[in-house]
Amino acid sequence: MLIPWEVWRDNLIQDAPESVARSIWEQLSPEPNQVNLDKLDLKRYYSLAIPKSFIYCRQDEAMGSGYFHPRMSSRLGAFDLLEMDGSHEVMFTRPRELADKLIEASSD
């Protein structure tokens, strides 16, 4: 499955200049959709007594508003919420800010 250009541009990397978004999109490789459908048993993961952090990118519209936070983040139990501006693809559009948030998340 390859993400159509319009979906990529409008929902996943809308904070990048169009030339950057297109350059990255042209390098994407199709991947099987089955990985998105497989059910995983995560009971053991959720029961781990480790610190958990969630980096919430405020403009992430990949799955619609609220999908990642609070819907997915609420599964973590107690966690630190770290927020930043950016789309789903902040590793391309805001790498320095993302690196800072990862360091902050690891500081528990």
Predicted segments — roles?
Residues 1-12, 61, 87-94:
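Low-complexity, flexible helical/coil segments
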Residues 1-46:
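Helix-rich cap/lid subdomain of alpha/beta-hydrolase
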Residues 43-49, 74-76:
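Short, conserved loop/helix-junction motifs that constitute active-site signature segments
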Residues 47-48, 54-56:
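Short beta-strand/loop motif that positions the catalytic acidic residue
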Residues 48, 105-108:
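Glycine-rich phosphate-binding loop signature in dinucleotide/nucleotide-binding domains
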Residues 58-85, 92, 104-106:
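Conserved loop-alpha-helix segment in the C-terminal half of the alpha/beta-hydrolase fold
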Residues 95-103:
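Short, amphipathic alpha-helical "lid/cap" segments that border enzyme active or binding sites
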